Amino acid sequence: VKLIIPRLGDLLVLTKDWSFPVMHEHRNTSIIAHDGVKYVPTEYVTGTWERIYTYSDHTLKAGTVLSIARYYIRQGAGEFDSITFVVHAIDGVKLKKKLRFFVSTDAAAQADFEYQN
């Protein structure tokens, strides 16, 4: 197995449907709204900075075109490792307004894709 790390901005096409959990956080509102899921804002535990996050499951169909906008990885803070994606087209239709969202690196590693020429 070879390590493949797409460059930021490279266009990728999903070769299989990809299902993943999305954290209800303001940076993910576009994909949450696109899928018709009600956004549930983050709650804080009273008197602390501890957060209670809500997640919802989302699926992008095979053929969806997306790119990577950001990698976030910090040593010693693995629970925050994430990749931000931008969806450019679904079902062969270019989106007028791109969907931008982030998922954990573990969720991103489950995506099957190929590079778009």
Predicted regions: what they are:
Residues I73-H88:
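Short aromatic-glycine-enriched beta-strand elements
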Residues V1-R51, A109, E114-N117:
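SH3-family beta-barrel domains
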Residues G9, K61-G63, K96:
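Extracytoplasmic
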Residues D91-N117:
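Intrinsically disordered, low-complexity, charged/polar segments
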Residues W18, Y72, D91-V93:
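Residues that cap or initiate secondary-structure elements
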Residues P6, L60, E79-D81:
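A short, structural micro-pattern
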Residues W49-Y72:
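Conserved beta-strand/loop element in small beta-rich adapter and peptidoglycan-binding domains
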Residues L12-L14, L66-I68, I83-V87:
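Hydrophobic beta-strand residues in large extracellular and virion-surface proteins
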